[in-house]
């Protein structure tokens, strides 16, 4: 028990120091060679740097842990590491509580089932998040990058999604009632079983989607929207999806 508590304290210390360091280093700078140093972590100094890709491997992040003149080195996948960094920055900036793992088994930012109601994510990069069953009620998601986001069964009632890019987003069984989706790019998004009752879709780009698979479009405003109906062949009434928890 004592060893476990010590490890947990060390882990929290690393996460805290890394989150603080990320205030001063962005993705481009880190990938271009800027290093991240975490000082005095249980008596160790940790150096994080981005290594170049080789012929047979993807780019990796090199982790060097130095203590008393001895250095231990390891490597992790670069994109997966940066997704952890993205998640830490989001959690810190928006006071998000995530007691589970930061990244899903598929490498997505893990926001599954998280309460995100009444938050302001305007202009954020939320691409490739897994927010299935998350609660976004009355949240500001305007001009947000939601490309490839998994919003399956999410509660998006009365959210502001104006101008957001939701290309290839999965909105299966999502509650989008009374949402403002004016000017949203929904190209190739999945709307199977989604509820678009009283949703504003004026000026939205609806190419390569099957609106007929939505649960309801009652009262939806489609004025000026661009719709090229190209249903995805692998989604039908027999496709298995998770069920909403709200």
Label the model's feature ranges.
Residues 7, 26-27, 77, 117, ...:
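N-terminal leader/targeting signatures
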Residues 16-17, 33-34, 43, 56-60, ...:
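Intrinsic-disorder/low-complexity loop/linker signature
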Residues 14-19, 46-48, 63, 81-89, ...:
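Extended low-polarity, hydrophobic cluster-rich segments
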Residues 1-45:
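A surface-exposed partner-binding patch
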Residues 29, 36-38, 48, 62-65, ...:
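Short linear proline/tyrosine/threonine-rich motifs used for host-factor recruitment
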Residues 49-53:
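Short beta-strand micro-motifs enriched in acidic
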